[in-house]
């Protein structure tokens, strides 16, 4: 409850509105777009609480990990856990600007662009986003590079439908588009510039406490795709967090190139990172057509080339991707419940 109470106080100070996150958790209230600010506070509080429980009852500290990474708000949580900033320093700018993001989200939808065969031509998709935006029917941008065959786009108004129609006419028939019906805050896209969110955030970040020491463990950033944080550049990196797309695939590649063998997923209901690694593992397993990596042979290589050319390209230059099916995944929320200690 300590972390939820602290997060509630930070929320109240930043928004001048009272919230009781402890009550919300006890009542198991669902979050929504309208309660986006509360969700931000809740997620970071739950992350901190889980890590505190892991340390207090099991003697396992965050700093025992070889490295950390997080998608979107998860990277903010990683910087807090790695003692670069206190929670208030990073949450306050986000909470102060969250209202603008929610207002922008009212006419924003997400599109998933994916391929069942070839690697996506990302520059062509980026170009189509620019072309569609120039038609003055709303801004559309890539918000995340999920994999060589998948990107997420966020678009305003009619831009999503215009993008879909043009994509269907211009791209390979193996390139598909799926529209998500929910509304999404346009974080990690240029859309937030319409409310000057990046500039306002950067001004706030200039004077927040902290940020003048390196993380206690290396953090692979979804902003840069590598371990780029040092003892003074976190503010500059975080400026780009606001309006630049997430480089999730670069992070996955980098993580698999290290010596990690277990991934501990921190926070409430983690989804995109486990899902991305699970899809990669299934793709590799189905092509290897064997019970272990030792079954990888010429026939498997041939099959990969024929059925998943995007995967073949990346395996040829980055064999470490083959480690994906061997990783052990621990959902910390579930693990803590399964190993609860009586007090």
Regions flagged by a language model, labelled:
Residues 1-69, 153:
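Helix-rich "cap/lid" substructures immediately adjacent to catalytic or cofactor-binding pockets
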Residues 66-74, 78, 82:
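Gly/Ala-rich beta-loop-alpha elbow adjacent to hydrolase catalytic centers
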Residues 81-233:
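Alpha/beta catalytic cores of group-transfer enzymes, especially the acyltransferase/condensing modules
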Residues 271-283:
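Short Gly/Thr/Asp-enriched flexible loops that form oxyanion-binding sites at enzyme active sites
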